[in-house]
């Protein structure tokens, strides 16, 4: 049990935590804010925190009863300024560089004491390019200059992204194809690897950053180990109790399939690059994951949930 999943009768003694949630996005580096946000809301409530959610229209349902849901978009924060009233901490997910400053002004006016950014592994690459081209790094820099205590979280791909339909492209069509003909068709099936983290583990990292000063002013690499494509397929097959066919495609063939599924070229490029890179440099990148401090294990106080765990919880999506 997470150290952040305590007795649900814990008394409420803290201010409001505002979580921002947007519709599923397929651009590279995006995490499924709805799935992560719902895990986070449950964990914060179990800690005795008050939770408010600013959610885009298609994300307003299926929250715990005690969550205060306000319809609005963090990409247009001035249209929903009331969501910031009385807020102590903000989980900033789905923000846009063009309007993030408006959100930070509202947070500062509300006397918010902390902003935790759901970022990406893009900033370390964006640094090599002119500031006007930045996306993730622009958001991080704006938060750092806001005068509010901050933490940036750069996660691996989230296991639940396949359910919400967000980045990465690998695995995104598996529920449909497995229901249709029981065959997975992707590039780099044999050597491809991709790093994943369970959404509940990522939420526990966020909960720690929101409710503790231990991680203020730090960048947390919330990374899970690289998983081979074949191991993910085998996990699903074992849970289904049947074999799953696998056809290894060329990168161009995989690209064509993902384009037909409306994936943007940027997300496809990054997915293919990562599958190949993590496969070719597996030992090195596993070591990089193990070397990160604080580790996810350190922060949440238990081993990370596995892909087998996730599949067991979500197997109906593949039936």
PLM region spans:
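A hydrophobic C-terminal alpha-helical subdomain
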Residues: 253-319
């Amino acid at each position: 049990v997470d150290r952040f999943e305590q007795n649900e009768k814990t008394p409420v003694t803290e201010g409001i935590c505002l979580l921002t949630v947007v519709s599923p996005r397929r651009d590279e580096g995006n995490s499924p804010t709805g799935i992560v946000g719902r895990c986070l809301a449950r964990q914060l409530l179990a800690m005795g925190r008050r939770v408010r959610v600013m959610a885009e229209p298609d994300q307003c349902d299926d929250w715990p009863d005690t969550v205060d849901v306000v319809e609005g978009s963090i990409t247009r924060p001035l249209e929903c300024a009331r969501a910031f009233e009385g807020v102590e901490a903000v989980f900033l997910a789905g923000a846009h560089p063009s309007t993030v400053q408006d959100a930070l002004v509202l947070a500062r006016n509300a006397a918010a004491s902390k902003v935790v950014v759901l970022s990406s592994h893009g900033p370390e690459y964006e640094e090599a390019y002119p500031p006007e081209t930045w996306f993730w790094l622009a958001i991080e820099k704006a938060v750092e200059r806001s005068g509010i205590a901050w933490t940036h979280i750069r996660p691996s791909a989230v296991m639940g992204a396949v359910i919400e339909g967000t980045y990465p492209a690998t695995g995104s069509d598996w529920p449909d194809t497995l229901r249709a003909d029981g065959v997975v068709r992707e590039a780099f099936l044999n050597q491809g690897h991709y790093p994943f983290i369970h959404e509940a583990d990522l939420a526990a990292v966020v909960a720690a950053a929101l409710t503790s000063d231990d991680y203020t002013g730090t960048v947390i690499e919330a990374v899970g180990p690289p998983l081979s494509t074949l191991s993910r397929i085998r996990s699903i097959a074992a849970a289904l109790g049947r074999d799953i066919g696998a056809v290894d495609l060329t990168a161009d063939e995989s690209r064509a399939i993902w384009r037909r599924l409306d994936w943007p070229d940027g997300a496809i490029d990054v997915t293919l690059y990562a599958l190949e890179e993590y496969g070719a440099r597996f030992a090195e990148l596993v070591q990089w994951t193990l070397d990160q401090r604080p580790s996810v294990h350190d922060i949440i106080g238990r081993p990370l949930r596995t892909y087998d765990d996730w599949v067991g919880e979500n197997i109906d999506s593949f039936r």
